[in-house]
């Protein structure tokens, strides 16, 4: 699948401290220590609707990780999937009387436009679930052969399920107790009451063909992949086991990331799918989580269509810490516009005080678990001092603009 176009990233003299991120599995902030090539997998969209601000906040978070690694001199192998074969896509297509393939292609194209407008650096591998079906089938065959998965006793719909106890370490990624797992499994796409399952938490890895649904041939009969195994297969076949960061929203901690890890670990025998599990908070509107079911989504494309500067959207979402649930309000957007203009005015000066210390603070705050509130405050301080007091360093405004562009993805000057 085609990704979106990459924007140029300026180089900035110097280097920041090593990146530290909160790891969901270990419940602590700890160093991320990639090799020469840093590796990251971030779960992508199910393309049945436009990109809302909750999506955007997640992809902006991991764009910062990408930029910090690049700033440190790493090559970055970033993989993102598109869940272009799944129940929500079929349900929306049926509701609207539209072909599910056409719907998925249109919304994926709109997502790419939104990411490009927000200046999110594209993944090296952008993979649709449909493209990975052969890889999923190979994994499911391995599970069935090893006893990690079984076919339910249902002649009409012989689905294949992965045993939740197939790995000893199941549950380490989320740290949830059984009651919490049961609740989230039922609420987030699981089917605990499916007749024939041996454990309510066993996860679907191959769904036998149903009338009106697409299907592909397999040794277990025609069908299509389950949700979690798609990400396991895509990641393992691009960046292998033990990659540096797996990312997504906090609503993916369980079941999605728990099962993606368990599937991969069962297939490889490794103890840990990713070295770091990193999750973003939810974006809310009027005190509620932004979600399709509540009908309170704010879409990036709609804001762009209203003439909102994508850089202001980006700054508004970066104004809060990525791990916190936080609101989106008109005031957040207004403050972002004000901040953007402040920085642009400072970057347009012919000279100012040195920006070296401020750039060092920017790097330091971002390396400290992506502390964007402190990073943005440091940049505000330099910009105000530059505008109020001037300075004799003719390189400072250019260096300031380059650092903001490279590390935060916000362009202050026309190319």
Curated annotation (Swiss-Prot):
Transmembrane segments: none annotated. It comes from Rhodococcus opacus (strain B4). Its cofactor is Zn(2+). CDD domains: CysRS_core. This is L-cysteine:1D-myo-inositol 2-amino-2-deoxy-alpha-D-glucopyranoside ligase. L-cysteinyl-5'-AMP binds at residues 43-46, 58, 81-83, 227, 249-251, 283. A motif ('ERGGDP' region) lies at residues 187-192. Keywords: ATP-binding, Ligase, Metal-binding, Nucleotide-binding, Zinc. A motif ('KMSKS' region) lies at residues 289-293. It comes from the Bacteria. Catalyzes the ATP-dependent condensation of GlcN-Ins and L-cysteine to form L-Cys-GlcN-Ins. It catalyses: 1D-myo-inositol 2-amino-2-deoxy-alpha-D-glucopyranoside + L-cysteine + ATP = 1D-myo-inositol 2-(L-cysteinylamino)-2-deoxy-alpha-D-glucopyranoside + AMP + diphosphate + H(+). One of its GO terms (biological process) is cysteinyl-tRNA aminoacylation. Zn(2+) binds at residues 43, 231, 256. GO terms for cellular component: cytosol. Residues 1-20 are annotated as: Disordered. Binds 1 zinc ion per subunit. A motif ('HIGH' region) lies at residues 45-55. Belongs to the class-I aminoacyl-tRNA synthetase family. MshC subfamily. Its EC number is 6.3.1.13. One of its GO terms (molecular function) is zinc ion binding. Monomer. It is an enzyme of class 6 (ligase). InterPro entries: Cys-tRNA/MSH_ligase (IPR024909), Mycothiol_ligase_MshC (IPR017812), Rossmann-like_a/b/a_fold (IPR014729), tRNA-synt_1_cat_dom (IPR032678).
């Amino acid at each position: 699948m085609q990704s979106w176009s990459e924007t140029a990233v300026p180089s900035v003299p110097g280097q920041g401290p090593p990146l530290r991120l909160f790891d969901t599995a270990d419940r602590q902030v700890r160093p991320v220590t990639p090799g020469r090539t840093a590796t990251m997998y971030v779960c992508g969209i199910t393309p049945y609707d436009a990109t809302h601000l909750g999506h955007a906040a997640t992809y902006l978070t991991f764009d910062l990780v990408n930029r910090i690694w690049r700033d440190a001199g790493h090559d970055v192998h970033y993989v993102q999937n598109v869940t272009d074969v799944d129940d929500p896509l079929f349900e929306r297509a049926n509701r609207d009387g539209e072909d599910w393939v056409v719907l998925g292609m249109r919304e994926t194209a709109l997502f790419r436009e939104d990411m490009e407008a927000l200046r999110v650096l594209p993944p090296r591998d952008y993979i649709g679930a449909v493209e990975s079906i052969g890889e999923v089938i190979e994994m499911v065959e391995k599970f069935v052969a090893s006893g990690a998965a079984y076919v339910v006793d249902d002649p009409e719909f012989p689905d294949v399920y992965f045993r939740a106890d197939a790995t000893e370490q199941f549950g380490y990624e989320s740290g949830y107790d059984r009651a919490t797992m049961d609740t989230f499994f039922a609420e987030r796409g699981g089917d605990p009451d499916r007749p024939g399952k041996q454990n309510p938490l066993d996860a679907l890895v191959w769904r036998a063909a149903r009338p009106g649904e697409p299907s592909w041939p397999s040794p277990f009969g025609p069908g299509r992949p389950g949700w979690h195994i798609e990400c396991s297969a895509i990641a393992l076949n691009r960046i292998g086991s033990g990659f540096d960061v797996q990312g997504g929203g906090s609503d993916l901690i369980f079941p999605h990331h728990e099962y993606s890890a368990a599937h991969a670990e069962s297939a490889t025998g490794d103890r840990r799918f990713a070295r770091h599990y990193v999750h973003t908070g939810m974006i809310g509107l009027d005190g509620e989580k932004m979600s399709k079911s509540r009908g309170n989504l704010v879409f990036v494309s709609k804001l762009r269509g209203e003439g909102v500067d994508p850089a202001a959207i980006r700054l508004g979402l970066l104004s809060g810490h990525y791990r916190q649930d936080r609101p989106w309000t008109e005031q957040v957007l207004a403050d972002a516009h004000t901040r953007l203009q402040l920085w642009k005015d400072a970057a347009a000066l012919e000279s100012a005080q040195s920006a070296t210390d401020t750039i060092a603070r920017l790097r330091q705050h971002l390396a400290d678990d992506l502390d964007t509130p402190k990073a943005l405050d440091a940049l505000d301080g330099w910009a105000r001092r530059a505008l109020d007091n001037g300075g004799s360093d003719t390189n400072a405004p250019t260096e300031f603009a380059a650092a903001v562009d490279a590390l935060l993805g916000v362009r202050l000057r026309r190319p």
